[in-house]
Amino acid sequence: HFGLFHQSFKDGVQNELPDPWLTAHSWAEKTDTVYPVELAGKTYSARLYKLAVTGYEGRTNTLNLFDLDTIDESIVHDGITFDKTDIDKNLTLFLYPDDSDEAGRRLRVYQQYLMVSAGAQLILAECAARGCDYHDLADYAAIQINDTHPSMVIPELIRLLGERGIEFEEAVEIVTKTCAYTNHTILAEALEKWPRAYLDAVVPQLMPIIEKLDALARTRTKDESLAIIDKDDRVHMAHMDIHFTHSTNGVAALHTEILKNSELHGFY
């Protein structure tokens, strides 16, 4: 609903206010399509909104957005302060909520999974509607993991394909062919990693899959620094992306060379 914040200054002091992105008069079209998303043992309904975007030569692209009907903008007070634990009301309020405390960091995990799960379900639904065979998903869809925020789409898509009768090994192959990853930082220490405890609490259905992916990655390299789950029980999202996508690049050619030659050289 809101961007990071609307910035203003008064008497030399910064003031932070909500920055509305979606309003009652926006072009986002509410649909009847909802997808179930399980978070911390509770099932939420992610509603699909469609936003038409003018495309090349007068054609139209569609931006698919997801929201919860229970979101309540009135819980925001004193600038951009809100209860970060009230997931029903806050989950899609702010883009990248403040993660300076544990509640904010967990909220980011909630947000990321809501979007990738609903998005993956939409992709598979559209695939089925067009007569696409799930085994050939990579011929139908391309999923670009833009920075590490959507990384959970890898285990989630494997999970969804498993529900549709596809064995783990083939699901991994399908997802790897379907997904590509763009890395946005040249500092290895800045790459997103989550304490396993967060994922155990918020998305326990993904952890068995992430464990299997980690075990598979370890058969490819003995370098512990390239593992998905490290010795401190942190899950490295970028490592999972690199191991289980078909392509990794930086945001520019020079950026890609830096990643290859230094920060991510072990993978190259």
What residue ranges belong to the model's regions?
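A conserved ligand/cofactor-binding region detector
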Residues: H1-Y268
